[in-house]
Amino acid sequence: MTDRKASVCVLGGGSFGTTLANLMAAEAVPVTLWLRDPEMARHISEQHENPRYLPGIALDERLQVTTDLNAALATAEIVFLAIPSSSFRTVLQQIGPQLAGKQVVSTTKGIEPP
């Protein structure tokens, strides 16, 4: 039996995505958090805090952060979708082929407007 933990990618740097990724990082799960905002990604990487959604909450230093969607997905075995429902279709259209063979968990709430 092995203690190796599956690599995880969390797409979405809001409060829920950041919290999910941080909880996994705290348990030594190799996890990468993807978000669109380069300034926020830099801040989270350097300061270990998401000031927009989780101000004052210290994030685990093992949490990896990127704005490169392809890099985030490249080594992930499990992908959590924690993106707004308004962005869900657009993001899935970009990454659909990259999800083949991966476990995908959607944490997105709401429905996409017509």
Each language-model region and where it sits:
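Rossmann-like NAD(P)(H) cofactor-binding subdomain of soluble oxidoreductases
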Residues: L59, T66-A74, I78-P114
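NAD(P)+-binding Rossmann beta1-loop-alpha1 motif at the extreme N-terminus of oxidoreductases
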Residues: M1-P55, V65-T67, Q94
